[in-house]
Amino acid sequence: MLSMLESILLSVATSEAMLGILGNIFIVLVNCTNWVRNKKLSKINFILTGLAISRVFTIWIITLDAYTKVFFLTTLMPSNLHECISYIWVIINHLSVWFATSLSIFYFLKIANFSHYIFLWLKRRADKVFVFLIGYLIITWLASFPLAVTVIKNIKVHHNNTSWLIQLEKRELLINYVFANMGPISLFMVAVFTCFLLTISLWRHRRRMQSTGSKFRDLNTEVHVKAMKVLISFIILFILYFMGVLIETLCLFLTENILLFIFGFTLSSTYPCCHSFILILTSRELKQASMRALQRLKCCET
């Protein structure tokens, strides 16, 4: 039986998850509708659609995983179910981070303004960069999945073992956990680096505008700022997400601490929910579609 605080926290996390699913499904529906209407899908809309679909699956997986562990943790949890959920999460989580990183690289190549020949070469060959990212995704998948299998199997064994043995193996298991997530972590670091370069580009652009004596905020600055909001929010929310997943993993060693586990679930649910609404608010197309949807809902109520 859950305590009052645990029930409230679980309700908050579940509400976050449901809102995240609705927000991501909305992005998919808008982009797919435009795809059917225009008979083509732009690169940015493809990335946003793929990101939204992967996040819907991510939310379902972490929610299912949380509920099975909360209500089966003190009894007999089906180990095969836990193992299956963990494998699916490894694949979908990797794919979700890849789409988010691809989005950051797309913004960087489209918006940033550098005269360096490497940047100009990449800007002219954006399609090849995208193909390279697909190759990198496959390579990191192949490299990290065997380690993920080891971690999942070790957790399954240690969860059924004695407490002193768990304490003895904990450091090794956490090291393996970090290495198993090196693929998503490396992709995240690429997103951080592109955000840093985009910040430099914005700073240079503002200096250039000040040197020319312009006091008006131009379109290029607004585009830079919108992209920065998306990337910085992604970085902050993904750190919270990773912390939440790490807390949930650590709670496998602290089976009596349900509250801490639910807190980790709440943190991990924040990223796929909040960032999706930030994407909607910063995209003119998605924002207009959301305003039209809200107006229709108001008309239906009246």
From Swiss-Prot:
Its main location: membrane. Glycans are attached at residues 160-161. InterPro entries: GPCR_Rhodpsn_7TM, TAS2R. Residues 29-43, 109-128, 204-233, 279-302 are cytoplasmic. GO terms for molecular function: bitter taste receptor activity; G protein-coupled receptor activity. Disulfide bonds: none annotated. One of its GO terms (cellular component) is membrane. The keyword DNA damage does not apply. It is a multi-pass membrane protein. Keywords: G-protein coupled receptor, Glycoprotein, Membrane, Receptor, Sensory transduction, Taste, Transducer, Transmembrane, Transmembrane helix. It holds the Pfam family TAS2R. The keyword GTP-binding does not apply. The chain crosses the membrane at residues 8-28, 44-64, 88-108, 129-149, 183-203, 234-254, 258-278. Several bitter taste receptors are expressed in a single taste receptor cell. Belongs to the G-protein coupled receptor T2R family. Putative taste receptor which may play a role in the perception of bitterness. This is Taste receptor type 2 member 104. It comes from Rattus norvegicus.
